[in-house]
């Protein structure tokens, strides 16, 4: 109920994309997403999905317009949280699920968790081989640990834009008090 009220207010303000819930996490989140999607707002309704077909199917069933496709790319998460995924597995899975979601009619935002702790060579490959795919509508620079500096954000955003040709978004955390400065540097970089 509260999510629907907030979504209506955001829509009235002219917000063009509203990110609602993570339906794979709970039935309550799935109900909230469906309730917001059923409002018929002008804003596109997006939801978070893991890199799994069943998550994408749930987003479709709940009426989402698009997904924020989460997957690990920082080495600590790939090795310790996600059963030792390899870099190539991450790339292949991201491309496959992006295509699957696009075939279901969804917009796709590529959201590489822990991007700022990824090996630089791998992150560049990820942008070249997955981020540049036509199924990806935009790519997010995800600073999960809040460790990015404004200068690094500027360089990464410029490189991501060059490699993918896509709109680049920023997702920061304020662990070290730099979230706002990093966000502003990313916006200034394009």
Q: How would you describe each model-predicted region?
A:
Residues 20, 47, 110, 170-172:
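Conserved hydrophobic beta-strand within the GNAT/NAT acetyltransferase core sheet
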Residues 40-49:
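A glycine-rich helix N-cap at a beta->alpha junction
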């Amino acid at each position: 109920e509260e999510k629907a009220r907030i979504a209506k207010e955001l829509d009235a303000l002219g917000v063009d994309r509203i990110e609602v819930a993570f339906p794979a996490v709970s039935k309550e989140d799935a109900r909230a997403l469906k309730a917001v999607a059923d409002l018929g707002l002008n804003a596109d309704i997006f939801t978070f999905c893991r890199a799994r077909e069943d998550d994408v199917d749930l987003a479709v069933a709940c009426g989402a317009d698009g997904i924020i496709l989460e997957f690990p790319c920082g080495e600590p998460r790939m090795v310790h949280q996600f059963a030792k995924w390899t870099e190539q597995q991450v790339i292949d899975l991201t491309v496959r699920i992006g295509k699957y979601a696009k075939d279901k009619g969804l917009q796709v935002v590529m959201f590489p968790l822990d991007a700022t702790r990824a090996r630089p060579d791998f992150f560049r490959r990820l942008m070249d081989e997955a981020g540049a795919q036509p199924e990806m509508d935009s790519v997010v620079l995800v600073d999960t640990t809040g460790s990015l500096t404004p200068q690094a954000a500027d360089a990464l955003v410029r490189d991501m834009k060059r490699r993918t040709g896509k709109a680049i978004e920023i997702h920061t955390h304020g662990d070290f008090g730099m979230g706002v400065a990093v966000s502003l540097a990313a916006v200034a970089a394009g």
